[in-house]
Amino acid sequence: FYFRPQNDVVLEAGSRYKYTVKVNATGLTLEGCTIGSWVDGGGESGEAEDLGYNYDSNTKTYTVYNADGLMNVAELVNGGKTDINITLDKNIDLTGKGWTPIGTDYDNSYTGTFDGGGHTITGLTVTTNDEYAGLFGYLGNFNNGAATVKNVVMDGIQITCNHRSGYAGGVAGYSWGTIENCSVSGSVSGTMYVGGVVGVQRDGSITGCSSSATVKGTIKVGGVAGQTIFGATLTACYATGNVNIEIDRTQDISGGGLVGFNDGISLLSCYATGNVTSTGSSTGHVHIGGFLGDNYITVTACYWKNNHEQGISYNRGSTNVTKVDGTNVTWENAVDAMNTALQNAGSEWRYELNGALPT
């Protein structure tokens, strides 16, 4: 058969399209297309290939409903379709499947919107010598900071980046974009820039995100982000996973329960409870704190409780963080203060004290 588009319709190989099919005396007709020269198939039978996603050409959105679909869409992005939108329609189990991060580097960064719809991605595993590792390798860029990842739960991930100057995070290795309402559990391990959610957040924002992942790195290491720089903001984020710094013996070191090196523009209503430990020594500066390793900005209504007595190891900002000691400061006090600060900032995010810790 052949397609005769009535409008300027482009049908791409490897994509799926939905049409209304009408059967009449003269043949089959589709809305917007005509099928002609129909020939019977000679008695063969079979099933169409299931790509694991549906495609809406009007919105450039791929709706993914299984693991193969997510892997196929990742291939599309890494093959050059970097601005497509991706939506999860089901929980996705990647257990036993090798994962190649979406957006391989700056020149092939993902610039669309990924909406997890509150669904869970389970068992994502990355072991790579490439520079960027995570669900996304590289998110956004200088020309397009509108890239967004939101509403996804990353459960039981195992990310290992062996590149000597690598960037590793549960959601993204390197981000210029927006990351919102994402949570991470499992483990993230790398070298230079390592965080439970992102390795580096440059500009853009991380809002309402959390990590219980165990994080291990060597230079800039944090429970949520290894490093924040330039216009980056962190709002209503928390980390409960342990952070371990295997100190590089010649480099300046920054490690913290929330962020290793904090030099964005805003850090508001965040907390950290995971223990922060280190091994080794360095000829450079070593700054390791319960909340932040290095800080260069104003920190508002932030708290920590872990094995460190010092919340910020090296503080060039104008404010400090508060330790929850259970006597002078409780988590009830912290929730009240964090929510007041969020309200004053015009944010819709709020904490609730569910059990021992706020969520």
Describe the predicted segments one by one.
Residues E47-T359:
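Surface-exposed repetitive/solenoidal architectures
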Residues F1-L51:
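Extracytoplasmic cysteine-anchoring/structural motifs
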